[in-house]
A protein has these predicted regions:
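Tyrosine-centered aromatic motifs in long, intrinsically disordered, low-complexity repeat arrays
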Residues: 6, 18, 44, 53, ...
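Short amphipathic alpha-helical segments
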Residues: 14-37, 121-145
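Short glycine-/aliphatic-rich beta-strand segments at the starts of folded cytosolic domains
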Residues: 2-17, 108-123
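An amphipathic, aromatic/His-enriched active-site/gating alpha helix that lines ligand/cofactor pockets
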Residues: 32-39, 56-90, 143, 163-207
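Tryptophan-centric aromatic hotspots in well-structured domains and transmembrane helices
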Residues: 26, 73, 133, 148, ...
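Surface-exposed beta-loop interaction hotspot
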Residues: 92-116
Length: 215
């Protein structure tokens, strides 16, 4: 399985039109996804940002006809947004903890977050998260987090996490303290767009919302 992502910024005053056009192309888009074995496709929004996530068979290459269809669908939307990611190129994977991926999504909830890196801080962000991977070592995360990945493009960070609700528990005092220390340090290198740490900072940000999903 190959994980793929994309990111865009909706043009000022165009969010209603973006949603409308997404609805107009949706039946054709679903057929396109199914023909090309694209799974777990979702589109997320916070403020004027859009983040998309999906999964494909590894090393899949679209046929000429399907590439033409992809471009045709994109053209019908593109007046409403500017690309953050580069079409046809993967976003940079900054962190992953895929763990045990749940094939059945009925008992998972999503956490999708967005931040803006401060100038020159992309490598420091990557270094800190590489440290988490090194600390984890060969341990496979059983849950509740699963299929967790963080991506970057254009100075933005986008996180995608599938959380098994049957395994969630109240955090211990040690876990709370680690989170506070980690998120406080992260504020040195990035600013939040979504509301994930409003409880810590006292600020008020947008929640990420799912605009669309297709299994």
């Amino acid at each position: 399985m190959e994980r793929c992502t994309f990111a865009m910024k909706v043009k000022e005053g165009k969010m209603n039109e973006y949603r409308k056009r997404l609805g107009e192309i949706w039946p054709e888009l679903v057929l396109f996804l199914d023909r090309n074995q694209v799974k777990n496709f979702s589109i997320w929004n916070a403020e004027n940002l859009i983040f998309g996530y999906y999964e494909t068979v590894e090393n899949t290459v679209l046929s000429t006809e399907e590439e033409h269809m992809r471009q045709k669908l994109t053209v019908r939307m593109e007046e409403t947004f500017d690309w953050i990611s580069t079409p046809g190129e993967p976003m940079r994977l900054m962190y992953h903890d895929f763990g045990v991926v749940r094939e059945n999504k009925e008992l998972i909830r999503h956490r999708v977050f967005m931040t803006k890196l401060k100038p020159g801080c992309e490598e420091e962000y990557k270094r800190r998260h590489d440290g988490l991977i090194e600390k984890r070592g060969d341990t496979v995360t059983q849950g509740p987090d699963s299929n967790f990945s963080i991506w970057s493009s254009g100075g933005y960070i986008f996180g995608y996490n599938e959380i098994d609700t049957t395994m969630e528990t109240e955090p211990t005092e040690e876990e709370k303290q680690f989170t506070i220390e980690w998120e406080t340090r992260q504020l040195e290198i990035m600013d939040w767009i979504t509301n994930d740490v409003d409880w810590l900072t006292g600020e008020h940000h947008a929640a990420s919302i799912r605009l669309a999903w297709h299994a």
